[in-house]
Amino acid sequence: MAHLLGSPACMDSLRKDLTDLQGAIVDVFSRAGPVRFPSWKFPDRAACDLDMVALLEHYDHVPGDPEFTQLAHAVLLELVIDRLLLLLQSCASYLENLTLEQIVPPARAAGPCMSVGLTVRRFWNSLLRLGMLSQQAALQKRANQGETLTSKPTAKGEPAGSRELGTAQLVKPPSPVPGLPQACPERDSLPVSVSLRRPGGTAENTRSVHSQTIETALVPCDACTSVQSSLREVGKVVINLCQSQNLPSSLGRFQQLVRDSMGHRPLPAATVGLWAAEQSKDLACLGKLVGLLRAQLEEAEGQKDRLRMQVGELEQALQEEQAARQRQAQEAEQHRAQWERERQQLLAETSDLKTKVATLEGELKQQRESTQAVESKAQQLQAEAEHRLEAERQVQHLEQQVELLAGRLDGASQQIRWASTELDKEKARVDSMVRHQESLQAKQRALLQQLDSLDQEREELRGSLDEAEAQRAHVEEQLQSVQGEREQATTDLRLTISELERELVELRERERLLVAFPDLHRPAEAQIQSSGNVTDDMERQVQANDIRIRVLQEENGRLRSMLSKIREVAQQGGLKLIPEDQLWALRSKGIQGAEPPLQTARTSPGAPGRRHLPGSRPASAGRTLPGQPQASPPLRPHRRPGESSPEDATYLTNCAQSPIRALARLRRRLSPSSGRASPAHQPQERPT
């Protein structure tokens, strides 16, 4: 049987048996009333108070837990024993009620704790007493039937009804069994009724009198049916109220037990009494809940009055708030009028800016070309990236040196291990010498001297080991220092990169400002992207115009200084005027005979002959960026000896065509130091 412990089929069979036993127990309780005996499984609790539904849900088959499943199987077996004992105890109580002919079961106190044998013996004794009583009743019934058949009328004029009544009183049927449905007649009453209807030797003037009793009723009483239906309806209402208020319902559990055991059959008197008791418990619980709800209702009424007062205060505050909002609306109207005036003023300023834009359209093409300066900046950043690669190669070289030092450290470790093995060998020799001490007493002194020498060698080896450890620590310190230098170099490179990227972002932002906001009303073929906010666009346009104005003022200052220098040179006689025909002839000869000019000039982040953006000039004029070499003046093309200078001819031609370019070229020739400082601002010479 051990292999069946925990079997799902066995456990399901036990669960069904427990369900059937519980239904039978409820049926007996409905007829004899609940009996209160201690439980065999749980001695501290009454057997009739056990919640079998909860126990069956808890002790169930669990696939993943065999230990708990076996325990549940054992508990189910014990519960079967417990329910069987309770069934025997309740049946014994029911038999006692039948023996004593008690229709309503009396209230019983809690019974003693009885063993299985005592319970079975008590049940058997009750069953024997009932059997003896039933035999006595059967014998008495047979004797009464014999007397009825052999009896004759004593008087001729005696009515038949009186003899029938006397016979009926003589053969009185046994008392009805309490708890059985009243609609079911006794089987033993049928022959009695036959004997009453067919008396021997009846007179001609006799007549039958029919009487309806509880024992002979074939259908339930209409009043009982109506009362029980009303009781069920009231019970449903009470249970629904308890469920709606989240209250435990004793009547609901009792109704479920009655429905499982009896279905929709008429209830006995004992069950109706228990039904009324459980219903009164639920009604008392609902009465307490109604009292609490009334208290809460009174409290809610008080809160309602307080809320009304708060509503009045809030209405007054709302009126004040509305008045304040009206005042704010008036102030907002005044502000709107002021903003309208400011808008008109801004429109007037916009018209002024349009006139200024007309004067700055000539410089727009040069500003477009200045975007190429960013490309030169990118080339410089690429060169710096190459420098970073060179630094990374140096770091790799340092790492190789660190690996070399690590190899040396491994060699030193191997030497230390060799020394330790030698030391172990010497120790083994010493041990062998000690073992052979008795046989080599003559050589003891020599061995002692050799042992001293070995000790000295051991001390020397220990010293060498300490030196190797010190060298290893020194190598580790060098390795840490090299790693620190590497990390420092990496940090410096990252800082340099971040600084260059930040400068690149600034240059791009300046370029974007000067390219995206030169004018709010550009032609249709060159529309700029607007941010959607006219005020922000106008502020950016004003910023760009301020930058242009500052650049133009600086350019005017340089032009004035160049004019003064030109006038001084002209007064000294250094300038000569050449006719235009000779200039063209000289230029053509110079172009045919001159070698191609060399364009190998080192410049700052803008190509020679290209102008920076007005916003980017402060970054290049008068100072250089970190890591940026100073720009050198552009190299002049070589000339053959004996030829006229094509540069002079070109210079005079450009003077005739563009005075600004001529002044810039003359400034570069007269003041080379200023040309080296800011070559990015020199205008580019165009071939004619």
Swiss-Prot record:
The keyword Cytoplasm does not apply. Keywords: Coiled coil. The keyword Hydrolase does not apply. Residues 143-162, 168-189, 322-341, 366-385, 592-688 are annotated as: Disordered. Residues 143-153, 369-382 have a biased composition (Polar residues). Residues 671-680 have a biased composition (Low complexity). It comes from the Eukaryota. This is Coiled-coil domain-containing protein 157. The lineage of its organism: Eukaryota, Metazoa, Chordata, Craniata, Vertebrata.
